[in-house]
Amino acid sequence: MIEMEFGKELLVYMTFLVVVTPVFVQAIKKTELVPSKWLPTVSILIGAILGALATFLDGSGSLATMIWAGALAGAGGTGLFEQFTNRSKKYGEDDK
């Protein structure tokens, strides 16, 4: 088995989490269980949880490192989603 450098594997996991976290957040948004203003916080929490779950994958870092990486990926995923959907202009319309 070829060993990768820790930093490269962490970037792979974070990239995956940046893509997956907004999918989970959108599913939660559709249920309307969480007000829109809390979705960025939910995204960070989901990223942290997914990061913790990724601890069990080969080549992952410590639990604390993976939770931190997941939380950063959740924050990044929210930022990317906001950028692509341009919600910043209509944010007030989404609040319930």
Curated annotation (Swiss-Prot):
UniProt main location, coarse: host cell
Cytoplasmic side: 1-32, 82-96
Organism in which the protein naturally occurs: Listeria phage A118
Name of the featured protein: Putative antiholin
Any one GO biological process: killing of cells of another organism
Protein localization: Host cell inner membrane
UniProt-listed InterPro entries: Phage_A118_holin/antiholin (IPR009708)
Lineage: Viruses, Duplodnaviria, Heunggongvirae, Uroviricota, Caudoviricetes
Membrane topology: Multi-pass membrane protein
GO terms under cellular component: host cell plasma membrane; membrane
Parts of the chain on the Periplasmic side: 56-60
